[in-house]
Amino acid sequence: MKFRVVAVGKIKEKYLIRGIEEYQKRLRPYTGLEITEVKDSVLPNKLYQAEIEKVLIEEENRIKSKLSSRDYIIALDSEGSQFTSENFAQQIENLTLEGINQFTFIIGGTLGLSNSLKKEANMLLSFSKFTFPHQLMRLILTEQLYRAIKIIHNEPYHY
């Protein structure tokens, strides 16, 4: 099993980078976690619907250039399914038993993800009804991936 994250934009905050690196390190004995950043689009001062669509399509194209046919694509979106940590771990385990071995999580930029990219995803996943900065979402996702692996392996971490 391998986890991939394709995310729009670069993280500048050192505390987020350190947290993500810590969970990547913790995951190494179990699985790989590859994080790929794609360039975010420059947002115009006034966002009209046409400009929003243009930005979303630009970012969609950059994301798609990093995907492969082997990817089981899970797009993070506020409209997605919500799980408990245990249910999320069970979903990952069940999909693995079905033969899925590469999970690719997509995190959009400031404007989220295009509708067409969300439709093409195998699953839409929401961590909360709250809106989080996309940079922080990477840290939350990597922690939940580590938690899911520990649950799957029946090892202490999640209580």
From Swiss-Prot:
InterPro entries per UniProt: Alpha/beta_knot_MTases, RlmH-like, tRNA_m1G_MTases_N
Pfam families, per database record: SPOUT_MTase (PF02590)
Catalytic reactions of this protein: pseudouridine(1915) in 23S rRNA + S-adenosyl-L-methionine = N(3)-methylpseudouridine(1915) in 23S rRNA + S-adenosyl-L-homocysteine + H(+)
GO cellular component, one term: cytoplasm
Coiled coil start-end: none
GO-annotated molecular function: rRNA (pseudouridine-N3-)-methyltransferase activity
Keyword Flavoprotein: no
EC code(s) of this entry: 2.1.1.177
Family annotation (CDD domains): RlmH-like
Record localization: Cytoplasm
SUPFAM superfamilies attached to this UniProt entry: alpha/beta knot (SSF75217)
Key words, A-Z: Cytoplasm, Methyltransferase, rRNA processing, S-adenosyl-L-methionine, Transferase
Binding-site list for S-adenosyl-L-methionine: 76, 108
Function as written in the Swiss-Prot or TrEMBL entry: Specifically methylates the pseudouridine at position 1915 (m3Psi1915) in 23S rRNA.
NCBIfam families: PRK00103.1-3
Subunit structure: Homodimer.
Family to which the UniProt record says this protein belongs: Belongs to the RNA methyltransferase RlmH family.
PANTHER family (alphabetical): METHYLTRANSFERASE (PTHR33603), RIBOSOMAL RNA LARGE SUBUNIT METHYLTRANSFERASE H (PTHR33603:SF1)
Name listed for the protein in its UniProt record: Ribosomal RNA large subunit methyltransferase H
UniProt lineage: Bacteria, Bacillati, Bacillota, Clostridia, Natranaerobiales
Gene that specifies this protein: rlmH
